[in-house]
Structure formats: C-alpha cells, structure tokens
Amino acid sequence: MQQIYTVKEIRSVAARSGPFAPVLSATSRGVAGALRPLVQATVPATPEQPVLDLKRPFLSRESLSGQAVRRPLVASVGLNVPASVCYSHTDIKVPDFSEYRRLEVLDSTKSSRESTEARKGFSYLVTGVTTVGVAYAAKNAVTQFVSSMSASADVLALAKIEIKLSDIPEGKNMAFKWRGKPLFVRHRTQKEIKQEAAVELSQLRDPQHDLDRVKKPEWVILIGVCTHLGCVPIANAGDFGGYYCPCHGSHYDASGRIRLGPATLNLEVPTYEFTSDDMVIVG
C-alpha cells in the first residue's frame, strides 16, 4: 500500500536531518498514489489550419510591401542641394501629339521662328472667317427678332387711308380718322390761297411758308391735334379763318400755322401722296 507524504511532513523531516537540512528543504516532490492522481492527463488536441476569407484582402506588412514600387533607384546629388533619391518609372507611356501639331513645328531641332508668319496668318484667317460667320448669324437673329415686333400686314393696311378728293367741296374741311387721330383735309379757295401766300414769315411764331406745307395749293392736309395739349381744333373758326382750339384758345390760319394763343408749333403735316387728280393716299 502506497502512502502520500505531504509537504509539511517532508519539511519536518528535513528540519530534523541535521547537516542535510538545506538540501532536503530546497527540494519538494509529490509522490502520486493509487487513490487519486495529482495532475489530470491531458489529451493532445489536433492542430487545425486557420480559414481565411479570400474575398477580403489580407493586409499585412508582407502583403503591403509586395505592392510597393520595385524599380531602379535614381539618385541626384548637387553642390547646393541635399542628396535625394526617387523612384524611376519606366512603364509610363508618354503621349504623342504629333498628329495634332503643324508640320512646321514637328522637328524639335528646328527653330519655330522661321514659320511664325505663316502660322500667325493662318490663325488670323480662321479668326476672321469665324468672326464674319458669327456676325452674319447675329445679324439674321436680330433682324428676325426686330421684324417679329413690327406691325402685322392688317395693321399696316390700316396705316394708310385713301381719300377721294371729289367728295370735298371747295371751301370746306372734312375730318377723317387715321391711326387713331383726326385728319383734316381742306379744299381751299383761291382767296385763301392768295391770303396765306402773302403772309410774311416775320409775323409767324413758327416760321414756315405756305408752299412748304402743301403739294397742291388748293389742298391742305393736316393732323387735327393741337400742338399745345393735344385737343382737337375746330375747322373754319378763329380770328384767322383756319382752325381754333377751344381748350386754351390757340388760333391757326388756313395753312395750319399758329398765329395766336399758347401753342408754339404749327399743326403737323402727315406724309401723303397724290395718286391721281381725284385721289390722295395718306401714310
């Protein structure tokens, strides 16, 4: 039958052993008995390989160093600059723009001053042609835009009026509507013609001879709007037998010239044309 000696018992024996006490006290050992083992037996584990996720890159010092540039080193040394080392890339393809360059400057060993005038002339020619084309296109665009704002054909048709002169008796004045304004057409007598032709220009506020206001002496065509504040004068009235403005008392003669009152200008003469002895077109 085996016995198990404890540590305390071994130490007590070593203490009583005399000169061998230091040796015996420095060593202690447990002796296993048959009843219970001191240390449980361990079963060796089977080693397993670690499984890596191949979808994700494995970053380590070795993998990162493998991606570094591995090219010949180029060192540059100068007197006034510190030494430097850089990596030289020999796999870079420099683009060639020879197809887009002019023939005169393809040769790098040839001076470009010899072809300066020719190249400048070509550039000026292209610029001039482009400028003319842009100006022509802009002119057409502006013309079309301005013409779109002009009056239409039906409006232009109303801008002119035909008047039959045989409907106006001698010594009478007829009023028409033209462009939204009253239009006076007066058939003057010989007495009125001589009277207005004899008026001296020094007596007029707005000097103008009678022959300068008519194309035919017997016909006077005027716009019936007072030049003072825009009232409509009355025909065959006033101190001079022509037109009278009842608003502020302006007097005009038979030629439409201002003679008295606050108005300062003569009645306006529109543009007209005699197409025949019996027809006139105003506008």
From Swiss-Prot:
Main localization (coarse): membrane
Residue sites binding [2Fe-2S] cluster per the record: C226, H228, C245, H248
Disulfide-bond pairs as recorded: C231-C247
Domain (Rieske): residue spans on this chain: 196-281
Biological process according to GO: mitochondrial electron transport, ubiquinol to cytochrome c
Bilayer disposition of the protein: Single-pass membrane protein
A Pfam family: Ubiq-Cytc-red_N
Residues of the signal peptide: none
Cofactor detail note: Binds 1 [2Fe-2S] cluster per subunit.
Family to which this protein belongs: Belongs to the Rieske iron-sulfur protein family.
Protein's name in the database: Putative cytochrome b-c1 complex subunit Rieske-like protein 1
Organism expressing this protein natively: Homo sapiens (Human)
Gene: UQCRFS1P1
